[in-house]
A protein has these predicted regions:
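Bacterial Sec-dependent N-terminal signal peptides
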Residues: 1-30
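C-terminal functional modules
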Residues: 399-515
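Short acidic (Asp/Glu) and glycine-rich catalytic loops that position anionic groups and cofactors
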Residues: 24-26, 352-353, 411-417
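Short capping/connector residues at structural and topological boundaries
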Residues: 30-33, 152-154, 247, 296, ...
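Structured, solvent-exposed acidic/aromatic patches
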Residues: 38-41, 75-132, 136-403, 426-430
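Membrane-proximal, proline-rich intrinsically disordered regions
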Residues: 21-75, 100-103, 107, 111, ...
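Terminal processing/anchoring signals of secreted or surface-associated proteins
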Residues: 1, 21-23, 47, 134, ...
Length: 515
């Protein structure tokens, strides 16, 4: 490197002597690929990619926290993997979503909004960016509560280096306004941004995405502001939400640009994470055909090296989820292994890395299935027209059909879909529980949404993780604490937020998560 540096310095010196530094040095010294000159559409795509955790940030937080809190995926290991399994604040992992969104996603998307807001030829890109910005901020505020919002990601634009923290109530009010204006503002007769990687510039699909996200945001407020929730649910339905799985907001990966959850679980974490017993037990008890697509068990494995294809079984009847409340030592005692009928901790069921978590498996942000299930709840509350049972059935069917998007081998035959729907009709007496339990299944592998809707709805009715050492005072973790770095770089503002919100702990409830 030193040799190359000396060579380049010598070359530039020679050029100056031969031509005069003032003549063309400014031209030579101009960075033709300066990020500040990148096309906004390119920056928009990068924001979409980064929000999908393609760069790895946030993935470990989902694995250690969100998936574990909702008891779908769990690890028995501690140290760097400690989290929901031990009801513990692991300061190495709880800041990861914060870091990814503020350092990458929001810096990019705020820049796109700023660069296109006054350009009459880029109104569609401007409104697409506003929708993606709302999606990104929803994840952040749902995860942490009060956060920098109005002054966030404006260090370059406005030289704001210590942004204030806005209340979640104020954030949601603005998110809903932004989604309302941006979704309505999309216009297929104007310049179409055909290079966008989410919908290829399809304005009709972007509109349906925007209104479906508005529905999701509106339903977040069911416990704390039902009047506003109803208002925006009505707006979303009127505007037009997703109509089929073709409208899903999905990131499609390739062999080169991998699904980062799959990347983690196919590499260094391959033997560390397992399907949790409550999730497996629910799917088994209901003869759910999704279990065959989701789970694999390396029957009889007594160590990581024995988790090989010859032992792999996707037969639903042999799947065994790892119980909650154990670490790698206690789950390996002879009594526990005998109780669950497994040879070792490596014998519990895992996520199938050849189907839903193969390296090029898609990742879903907002889906038709989720949207129909939210409409079912809205109809149950009397906030929209339509039949609750019809929305419910459409939502469950949509997710069953969605399994085919992962891999042809994960597709569920129509006969199996129909049999499952026939066996599990909506029970009006248990409608909210049924709807949101199906939402739990339909949101598998979408950590932020799983965590948010579980807190909002209270379903499924999970049992508290019984791990003996716990840092929480609630039955479940309610939010992620702010990064320690914030107390160093933005102390006054973060302290104000902590005081307003009621503490910076795993047990502190965010505004919409009212008891």
């Amino acid at each position: 490197m030193k040799t190359k540096t000396n060579y380049l310095f010598g070359l530039l010196t020679s050029l100056c002597l031969l031509t005069g530094c003032d003549d063309k040095f400014d031209e030579i010294n101009t960075n033709k690929v300066d990020p500040t000159t990148l096309a906004p559409s390119f920056v928009m795509n990068k924001a979409i990619i980064d929000a999908t955790y393609l760069d790895g940030f946030g993935t470990l937080q989902m694995l250690c926290y969100e998936f574990g809190i909702v008891q779908q995926i769990i690890t028995p290991y501690g140290s760097s993997l400690a989290g929901a399994n031990y009801n513990q604040n692991n300061v190495s992992n709880t800041p990861l979503v914060w870091q990814n969104f503020y350092r990458n996603v929001l810096k990019q998307i705020v820049d796109v909004v700023d660069k296109t807001k006054d350009d009459p030829n880029r109104t569609n890109l401007y409104n697409m960016a506003r929708i993606w910005k709302a999606y990104s901020f929803m994840i952040l505020t749902d995860t942490y509560g009060d956060i920098p919002y109005t002054e966030a990601a404006k260090g370059y634009i406005s030289e704001i280096t210590s942004p204030k923290y806005d209340s979640q109530q104020a954030i949601y009010a603005d998110l809903l306004k932004e989604l309302d204006e941006a979704s309505a503002g999309l216009d297929a007769t104007k310049t179409v941004e055909s290079t966008d990687i989410l919908y290829g510039g399809n304005i009709a699909k972007w509109k349906r995405f925007g209104y479906s996200l508005m529905l999701r945001a509106g339903m977040r407020l069911t416990k704390v502001d039902p009047a506003t929730a109803r208002t925006y649910v009505t707006k979303a339905v009127t505007g037009g939400v997703m109509q089929s799985n073709d409208d899903n907001a999905v990131m499609r990966h390739t062999a080169l640009y991998n699904n980062w959850i799959a990347n983690h679980l196919q590499a260094r974490e391959k033997t560390n994470f397992y399907l949790a017993a409550p999730f497996v037990n629910y799917l088994k008890a209901n003869n759910d055909p999704r279990l065959r697509s989701i789970a694999v068990r390396y029957v009889g494995a007594k160590g990581g090296p024995e988790q090989v294809a010859a032992r792999a079984s996707t037969d639903p009847s042999v799947q065994v989820g790892m119980p909650m409340g154990y670490d790698n030592v206690t789950v390996s005692t002879p009594a526990v292994l005998a109780q669950y009928g497994v040879a070792s901790l490596w014998d519990f069921s895992q996520v199938n890395l050849n189907t839903v978590l193969k390296l090029d498996a898609p990742e879903f942000h907002v889906t038709h299935a989720q949207t129909q299930l939210l409409l079912a709840e809205a109809a149950q509350r009397g906030w929209t027209t339509g039949t609750v049972a019809d929305y419910f059935t459409k939502g469950v069917r949509a997710n069953l059909e969605q399994m085919a998007a992962y891999d042809p081998s994960a597709a569920i035959p129509e006969a199996a879909i129909q049999a499952y729907l026939t066996a599990h009709p909506l029970d009006p007496a248990k409608a909210l529980e049924q709807i949101n339990t199906q939402y739990w299944v339909a949101s598998f592998l979408n950590g932020p949404e799983l965590f948010a809707n579980f807190r909002r709805s209270g379903f499924p009715a999970l049992t508290k993780n019984p791990y003996p050492a716990s840092e929480i005072t609630e039955d479940f973790i309610r939010r992620m604490p702010y990064p320690d770095s914030e107390t160093v770089v933005n102390q006054q503002n973060v302290n104000e937020a902590i005081t307003r919100q009621g503490g910076n702990t795993l047990s502190t409830r965010v505004w919409w998560d009212k008891k």
